[in-house]
Amino acid sequence: MEIMKYAIPGYEDVTAEYLLGIFGNPIKHTLSPVIHDTLSDALGLSERYVPFCVEDEELSHCVKLAYDEGVLGLNITVPHKQHVMETLVDVDIAAKTIGAVNTLVRVEGGYKGYNTDMPGLAKALETEGIALKDETVIMLGAGGAARAVAYMCVSYGAKQVYIVNRTFARAQAIADDMNAFAGKTVVQAVASEDYKSIPDGKYLMIQCTSVGLHEGDGMPFDFGDAFYAMAKAGVDLIYNPAQTPFLKEMAKLGVPAVNGLKMLLYQGILAYELWNDLTVSETLTDKVYLALQDAIYGKKRGDNIVLIGYMGAGKTTVGKALAGKLGYEFIDTDLYIEAQEGMTIPDIFEKKGEAYFRTLETNVIKELREKTHCVIATGGGLPLRKENSDLLKEVGTVYYLMADADTTYARVKHCTNRPLLQCDDPYAKIQAMMKERGSVYARACHIRVRTDCGTLEEVMDEIK
């Protein structure tokens, strides 16, 4: 294939039934192959993802060449996100409004352009419990992905958006376009020297500049702690390094904040779904996210398999079967503690209290960091301590086993050894505790797996 002349070193000889790829310059450090090849391998699809280094003057030729040679789909990155629109047979309305395309999908006669950055970031925010409806937002910077961020804010119903930028005209151009799209004034441009004109309040703060990418970078704007303390949540679109000066400032101020890795993840997932007309499961999405983390930051956990989740999720049943299948040792942390203490869990609760028991759990996890080749089933309350959930991710890959309330109740209603269910209405207790703990479990795990809609073998296949 002639298009392979543009493949970067290491990819020239890639073969598959279908090719996917990305056009950009420079492109050698892209992480997109991690996303898409992980998906193809997991789904059993004969597709391979190739980075292509394409110069500006070759863009039109390469888009036509890729289509003629059957390339299934393409991502587009800098510097081509705007100019590529001239080569397409159609452009999605969101991409037109944003003025940038990052995904090409085969249609009759050529490619159609989409922008998955915007919905990718929206999905990333959703997973962090951040809703944009009626939100007030401060955007720092008006370059790069800022147009997609502003479009996302307007599309998802933000009440007010301030774009702070050193070059006022650039921020104003985005504000004008987004307000025209909204049909009302939602977005306001603010020159960086006028940042104090933003009313006091609490804002979702999104860092859209490239400041923080390089060692020695400072804050995107030197506005002082009082300004950044207006953030009630922070997002930095940069994902490498994992902790930018902006994110460190958020941490210092006690503001919950995340980097841009999940945006990278979800924009890639959405592109893959468009190319293949399928839906990627949350379990597979989590596996791709873990692969990205390993590729960027390095693997920082043991080879054990750790199972967390609410009582009745199947941690013991799945854990024992999986350990047998893999030839691993099976460890149940509750039984481990009972053996150490010489009494049952209910007795520990009754005689020494829950706080004492939770401390025992923490000590057990510290011991288990030295173990290898184990499947570890944890007590339902063990990940509730932040210290415990952090330690678990050092022990091994953490899987959150999930089941709905009806399934859970059916599994545990006859159990007499569960202290937390010794109440008048155990079903209501289950519902309340699952709601309370669900987000904690999700943050404590690497990968989510449902155990209420498949066989034991199918559940084990999702894990290993």
How would you describe each model-predicted region?
Residues Y289-G302, A321, K325, K435-K464:
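NTP-dependent small-molecule kinase module
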Residues K315:
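Conserved lysine of the Walker
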Residues G24, N115, L125, D134-S155, ...:
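Glycine-rich adenosine-cofactor-binding loop
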Residues T185-A257, L382-S389:
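Rossmann-like adenosine-cofactor binding region
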Residues Y6-I130, P241, L247, L253, ...:
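Phosphate/diphosphate ligand-binding glycine-rich loop within oxidoreductases
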Residues E394-G438:
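A glycine- and Lys/Arg-enriched "phosphate-lid" helix/loop adjacent to the NTP-binding pocket
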